[in-house]
Amino acid sequence: MGRGTGHDQYELAATSEGGRKKKRDKKKKDMDDLKKEVDLDDHKLTLDELHRKYGTDLTRGLTSSRAAEILARDGPNALTPPPTTPEWVKFCRQLFGGFSMLLWIGAILCFLAYGIQAASEDEPANDNLYLGVVLSAVVIITGCFSYYQEAKSSRIMDSFKNLVPQQALVIRDGEKKCINAEEVVAGDLVEVKGGDRIPADLRVASAQGCKVDNSSLTGESEPQTRSPDFSNENPLETRNIAFFSTNCVEGTARGVVINTGDRTVMGRIATLASSLEVGRTPISIEIEHFIHIITGVAVFLGVSFFILSLILGYAWLEAVIFLIGIIVANVPEGLLATVTVCLTLTAKRMAKKNCLVKNLEAVETLGSTSTICSDKTGTLTQNRMTVAHMWFDNQIHEADTTENQSGTSFDRSSATWAALARIAGLCNRAVFLAEQSNVPILKRDVAGDASESALLKCIELCCGSVNDMRDKHVKIAEIPFNSTNKYQLSIHKNANSEESKHLLVMKGAPERILDRCSTIMIHGKEQPLDDEMKDAFQNAYVELGGLGERVLGFCHYFLPDDQFAEGFQFDTEEVNFPTENLCFIGLMSMIDPPRAAVLDAVGKCRSPGIKVIMVTGDHPITAKAIAKGVGIISEGNETVEDIAARLNIPINEVNPRDAKACVVHGGELKDLTPEQLDDILKHHTEIVFARTSPQQKLIIVEGCQRQGAIVAVTGDGVNDSPALKKADIGVAMGIAGSDVSKQAADMILLDDNFASIVTGVEEGRLIFDNLKKSIAYTLTSNIPEITPFLLFIIANIPLPLGTVTILCIDLGTDMVPAISLAYEAAESDIMKRQPRNPRTDKLVNERLISIAYGQIGMMQATAGFFTYFVILAENGFLPSTLLGIRVKWDDKYVNDLEDSYGQQWTYEQRKIVEYTCHTSFFASIVIVQWADLIICKTRRNSIIQQGMKNKILIFGLFEETALAAFLSYCPGMDVALRMYPLKPSWWFCAFPYSLLIFLYDEARRFILRRNPDGWVERETYY
């Protein structure tokens, strides 16, 4: 990526003439390029070599004419927006994708059938026309609803644009100029100061106390020092490179631009995130599988009966009408709306629990998740450095790191602690922002870096106001922290009259501080710093460092009054005061502590077999300590390094398979082949990836997906966006998350709490179970809707159930009950189950079809036919008379058709009886659907065990009954929908069948519970 001539642009488009294969190969190559580690060598160059490579004078910068040439060659310093999907295409996908397509085909077939009838008959029935119109309306309404739900999604590049700084200070022709950041070119000499955003990737040429916040890029929460020194082979870790769009927190720096726009590290991440192919959600794959089943059944039945009707001597036009009728009757019209509404309801329920779902289908994906790759900072941890331990009086004391200060407290009476607290408060530039007196100390905003803020809050909590302490000890002189000295020093007036007038306080890297000390304070008394005390210090330092904590050393010195009288001029440039032979006081160590709820949440993920992997940009020791703290590495599980240390043998002699846990450094990951990565993911149950780059996060996600896992990724930085986009479900943080990560994600945790993910998994699993129940309920009524049509063709009887009445069931009485199943409570502890295997555990499987169609559906059809035959018999047509009567029955010109008793019936009278039969068949289906709804509440438990607590479902039972009664008895329905009033006794014909369905299924589930894995479970447990 270092660019003398500057043409290694990462554009992801290819020219058309190369043909599609070339384009695909190029795209794959581009993607592979982007996934590679950042390949920079500019950090290794000396300033002379840098001058030769970019032609930049390190005092005068580029000439304006040269800058214009480079701008013309490389283009503006801006990120290229990715090709976006137009809104109309998104809308069309909702209208014509998946399930909608099936309904459209149904609608077209209806219009076709109506067309054939209109061409061949004088007065065609309008049923097929109505059906076609209703089907089209259903698709359009649900399509608009889904589009509206998802319209708020995926604006990735817009937020990347927000990251681009507006202005930049460059030096051209020896003059400082403030120009638009888009005009910055490679080779420009740029100046940045605290508060600025870095305008491009810079090679630092000079710096004064410069620190940058790389957290959005690398995930490191601490500000990083920037200086001209080459400190690391890895360009992401070296001190002399500052990255585009990170923030300069303090100090100033001057540097040469080495990359602009898409060629910057951030540009590569942006291109990578926006050009990733996103896979389909598990639920959309399930729905497609379901459509294949339904379509298969419909076409098989349709074609079979088409051939049969031709054999039975029907005209081919009639046979085509039958074919279309059967195919359409198989389409569950209400199901599309049911699924959409169920997912929306769950999304709303999750929003109340702080999970905001951007993409409806992601609701279920989270339930199928088998691996969670979680970022550390801010997700598993509180994202605030906190003092965790102190070492003074030769003893380690534990501080309280809990969010609500409910943890341990230590002995604060020691004089050494008072001295330590005084240094931590005075040798500290952090201050609380104004007007926060009523805010709890831990929640207050602080101006200053993370470590100093932690010390400030700790001292404020333990010792009262730090401001008062600073007022009493006025600061006279200060040497700020720098990377060469590795300490910070300040001199204060001492208000305590028993001590000398001036107090020197110092903090910094523990080993550097100890080197400057000759005495140590123990229990308030100074004593010589002997080897024994040095060993004690070393042990404490190693122990705290091993906990992944950032350790600082503290010392002080009372400047003698005879040499440093009041008014003495302290010179911090030519130091005129002692900085050796000081008195060592103690250590304080800080960590970004785990969130309180995370340990429990990780445990909850573990019990159903969800693997939790930590992926972080932080140091391996810190990462491992937090992983142990939150249970990602569980107690007693060792890494290869732990085993080697325990057995006292070299690491390479340990068999990696013996270690259940594993900490992989980004540097090692870079050199692993995909096979080696697969091996790690397969054979270690507890994994931590530390010091990872954005590209590596993506490679880890792809590795998990190769194992067949459904992967959820949590993250908050820009660096997480490619992984969030690639994952089956990306989960971003709502509070700390960058805009970019929120746009790339499918779900946002509004409270940034990992524990909310567990709630999401639970809801996702529940919706999958409940969708199964809803589909089982909806499909069952398909059989009593299709069989009347089949008998109409085969047995030549008057039509028992009309098209309009079928619509009244699918889009009327069945809708509310089907949706009410989305509110059903979980049957058992769904968080104890293993994650769903997408290959074997389908939303709709053969067993569900067998129960819905073959068993319950057949009983329902029998109930309908029983009522149909009862009504016709009461009107004089016994079953034996009905066979073969259809042609005469439907003939308008036959007005003297005799029944079983010799009575003659006109066409009008016959049709009134037929439509009354349609209405009663419809009412019977409603009554048997009562039982079906109740048995669909549970797949394994008894109804008595499950209870009838679902209020929406009880409402659904009353609603469908009331609707059926309304359609039957409302005046005018005979004209509008051809539905006629029923005698009260006819409602009761279906009751025995309803009871039979209930008892049959209770018995089936009883056997299922008594004989787990038995024949009944294998054949009927859906």
Curated annotation (Swiss-Prot):
Protein localization: Cell membrane, Sarcolemma
Top-rank EC class of the record's enzyme: translocase
Region described as Interaction with phosphoinositide-3 kinase: 81-83
A GO molecular function held by the record: metal ion binding
Basic and acidic residues bias locations: 1-10
Cytoplasmic topological domain: 6-86, 152-287, 338-771, 823-842, 938-950, 1006-1022
Pfam family, one: Cation_ATPase_C
Entry-annotated residues carrying Phosphoserine: 16, 942
Keyword Ion transport: yes
Reaction(s) catalysed by this chain's protein: K(+)(out) + Na(+)(in) + ATP + H2O = K(+)(in) + Na(+)(out) + ADP + phosphate + H(+)
EC number: 7.2.2.13
Functional note: This is the catalytic component of the active enzyme, which catalyzes the hydrolysis of ATP coupled with the exchange of sodium and potassium ions across the plasma membrane. This action creates the electrochemical gradient of sodium and potassium ions, providing the energy for active transport of various nutrients.
Subunit-level organization: The sodium/potassium-transporting ATPase is composed of a catalytic alpha subunit, an auxiliary non-catalytic beta subunit and an additional regulatory subunit.
Protein name, UniProt field: Sodium/potassium-transporting ATPase subunit alpha-1
Organism: Anguilla anguilla (European freshwater eel)
